[in-house]
Amino acid sequence: MTAAEICGWAAIFEGFHVKKSEVHGMAQRGGSVESHLRFGKNVFSPLIPDGKVDFLVAFYREEGGRLKKLLGPEGVDLTGVLEEAQKCVPERKYLNIFMLGKLSSFLPIKKENWIKAIEQIFHNKNLAENKTVFMKGRGEDR
């Protein structure tokens, strides 16, 4: 959920129209949370139909496998980066930020707007660590 929130803010700061939706699959009992995020000039619905997703970012390999049906023909599945991510983050709680760093290299959003979005969400709470991990995900060690 935090990852979709940060991505949404980064897109807003870039000047895009943003719609976001979350589907909670018994998350309070350890189930998955599926977030859909769309941005562009004019976005009318937050839900993305099966076979139309441009980027799939999953934080568990099993979830990536289950959600693969959502990917479009030209879609990019970032699930394969999970192994690298787990080696690069100091704690699992930073995995989503690392994955956002990877995703950010594909999207038309300036790095400054990603950083601004991270600051918007985290304020002072682990802000330096989150920025560092985000930059590692981008392949830019700070």
What is the role of each PLM region?
Residues 1-142:
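Active-site cofactor/cluster-binding pocket
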